[in-house]
């Protein structure tokens, strides 16, 4: 999910 906001 971190990749989505980064």
From Swiss-Prot:
Nacreous layer of shell. It comes from the Eukaryota. This is Uncharacterized protein IMPP1.
């Amino acid at each position: 999910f971190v990749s989505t906001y980064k």
